[in-house]
């Protein structure tokens, strides 16, 4: 029995085999080959614990055998949620060896997400941590049963009862070894999670062949080798940290993964120094924190050679700081759990590295950039990204409607990204088509949050849009129409938390409005909501900037002439130039003719609306 999925057309599959991309070996071969070549080499450092490749192989085999003893194997699925600990990889290889297909949930996911995943895959096995709020008591049993997904076997990290203790099952062999085997190389190895725009992420079946090549190709582009010490500080379950090149790429190259609980700078800097880490992969929001903290701790980062940044668009202004502040080489990454991975190369020019998201890692990655009618756009013009290739999937799991809209007749997958092809052949990401917020690499589906907000008894309408943020790339802003004009933002966030959503999905900003703007066909006018965000952000920026320029500006009266606060002509010229740099076309003469904050707000809003 195998997991159903949409396979590659035979002609393309044969082409990928002929080119050597697909080698018809299971992902377990990554570990097996390392054990043959260097069984005593360090594979994982986790706190005070060390695991060689031989030990990783032995422990994962014990767990695989014990799971097989329970009748689990090919055709079964597992829901796994573990923090950044060595057990994550022990469990992963055990499941791959036993032919059990895992879905690795992020540790930030809560009851709502976990039960939705369980409903989709109906797992026979659940592996989680007592440290997580959902599993601190046994109420989760009923929650899973209510969605028709009660696992046959549950193993918990931190559980005291040996019968359900993950640690006990890993360390204690069964009464007798039981045979097990991975699924075939052209079958599903694991599920990844999409950054869905319609609520709970869709599931992405990844086969051994395509995922193995994904990790190998990225490892080659990033020049990983047996001397690589890779810091895993972003959630290990992320596709970025698992296979792009991530831990699987490091294991393929014979390097060592150093586990970090989070990307918090000071604790990570200590790990870099202690273990001579030379490579790290981070999302832009984490890099921003590292850049702030690094100047006072530069001596701890002497071994750091490479920084891979992905998960969200990395601002040029931050990218340019990396070599000087962190003392390492930057590689930008633009990838997706569905497949296509782009990297800047180690020998690219500074401008390519700082201002683009690189180019595909495989010679057989096919991309096209098209307009809304599917016509290719001119070079340098923004368009929708479509792709297919040897590690880009061919369909979401049991989702025919979504697949019909996500793929064209030629099998190209439309990611929802707006990109520009630069003269150097690199991609620059300029936006998204999907109704989704990319918050520091974590994807938030607007529709999901809107549907949950209107469950509040005092909310009649809700709309969620992205707003720009230098550190995170994007934050979320919720516009809410309420029956109660005194409804406060904390009450709405409390309502969302009580529904069991992940904390990163909470709106960063909540604004109550009298009426929801609608399009001609009665849908929420997201363009108008984004305009409201832009106007508010500009108002806030303008007021803050004036306070920086004016000495006596504690209480700025919007109707008072700013000259009487001490603002001079040179400062007005500077403001006009700064507004122009923000894309707002106003002249010095226009500002000088009506020098009040209220007039400037009105002028700027009119220009933004016109634009």
From Swiss-Prot:
Keywords: Ligase, Phosphopantetheine, Phosphoprotein. Its EC number is 6.2.1.61. The keyword Lyase does not apply. Residues 533-608 form the Carrier domain. One of its GO terms (biological process) is siderophore biosynthetic process. Pfam families: AMP-binding, AMP-binding_C, PP-binding. Pathway: Siderophore biosynthesis; pseudomonine biosynthesis. The keyword Phosphoprotein applies. Its cofactor is pantetheine 4'-phosphate. Belongs to the ATP-dependent AMP-binding enzyme family. Involved in the biosynthesis of the siderophore pseudomonine. Specifically adenylates salicylate and loads it onto its peptidyl carrier domain, via a thioester linkage to the phosphopanthetheine moiety. It comes from the Bacteria. One of its GO terms (molecular function) is 2,3-dihydroxybenzoate--[aryl-carrier protein] ligase. The modification O-(pantetheine 4'-phosphoryl)serine is found at residue 569. It catalyses: salicylate + holo-[ACP] + ATP = salicyl-[ACP] + AMP + diphosphate. This is Pseudomonine synthase PmsE. It comes from Pseudomonas entomophila (strain L48).
